[in-house]
Design a protein with these regions (language model features):
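N-terminal targeting sequences that direct proteins away from the cytosol to non-cytosolic compartments
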Residues: 1-292
Length: 292
């Protein structure tokens, strides 16, 4: 279990972090592109990237707004920053903009003064209402962690940590199943979330689910953790040689955990080109849980 933020829901995705109202839903559009909505009504859009543009903040902002003008076919004009955006000015260079003639900002370009990350914020119709009523999510917006801190991820109702050398590769957020794949130079890690677990377990046994999602024919063991299964495989020397010739990762480790109190199943599946260290599996298991 992972503790939730006191007055909201933590979202931490690929370097960006903020706390949003509990009733908001998060839609992942791309590796660095999120949309937040309530009752199927979009409210806020965030896109970000590490800066590859030359020049100072003013030149970078001008280049981004010129591109936005092409995308939207609307004239982009600078406007005065609204009060909710004011909380960002200690950390970011902030340039609010309007698409057309609206006096209220339609969004803003932020450039971090510390790491030069560029964040594009877009507001949707009705934004004025929730900015007036809700706690300001921009007060919690951050794009980098203190040096030596392992990256934290929090999406939907799960949270986990990874070592710095892993990067996001692919993801799937389907009804009842989430799958997020990370890669390093030698190891792949897949995080699974099955919800509601009770629905999946009516259709298949826990062991069948374990084998299906991990594509495993290796022996399954009972884990030391309650309601958990684990499987591990180390290849024979000839298997290892053949796997390396075909650039496959022959070492595997899988773990599935049923959390009846949350009606969730959380899974981990690792493949590696070398033996998987116990320290890594302990780290991943200890930091993977449901946000309560």
């Amino acid at each position: 279990m992972v503790e939730s933020e006191e007055q909201g829901k933590l979202i931490a995705w690929n370097g960006l972090r903020l706390v949003i109202p509990q009733q908001w839903e998060t839609i992942v559009r791309d590796k660095r592109h999120l949309i937040f909505e309530q009752d199927l009504h979009p409210l806020l859009e965030l896109r970000w990237q590490r800066s590859t543009l030359s020049g100072d903040s003013e030149k970078k902002t001008a280049a981004i707004l010129a591109q936005l003008e092409k995308e939207t076919s609307n004239p982009v004009t600078h406007v005065k920053s609204s009060a909710p955006l004011g909380a960002l000015q200690k950390i970011y260079d902030v340039a609010a903009f309007s698409l057309g003639t609206a006096g209220f900002p339609d969004g803003a370009v932020l450039i971090c003064k510390s790491c030069a990350t560029i964040i594009l914020i877009r507001f949707f119709s009705g934004t004025e209402d929730w900015l007036a009523k809700e706690s300001n999510p921009f007060q919690t917006l951050g794009c980098h962690l203190p040096q030596g801190t392992e990256p934290t991820w929090a999406i939907q109702d799960i949270s986990f940590q990874l070592l710095e050398d892993f990067h996001l590769d692919t993801y799937t957020f389907a009804f009842g199943m989430s799958r997020i794949l990370f890669k390093s130079s030698s190891t792949d890690v897949i995080f699974y979330r099955l919800a509601p677990a009770s629905t999946h377990l009516k259709q298949s046994s826990f062991e069948e689910l374990f084998r299906r999602f991990n594509d495993s024919t290796h022996p399954i063991e009972k884990s030391d953790r309650e309601h958990s299964l684990v499987s591990r495989h180390s290849p024979h020397p000839l298997q290892y040689l053949l796997a390396r010739l075909s650039r496959k990762k022959p070492f595997t480790w899988s773990h599935f955990r049923h959390l009846p109190e949350y009606d969730r199943i959380l899974g981990l599946h690792l493949t590696a080109s070398h033996p998987i260290k116990q320290e890594l599996t302990i780290f991943l298991l200890s930091n993977y849980g449901v946000i309560s």
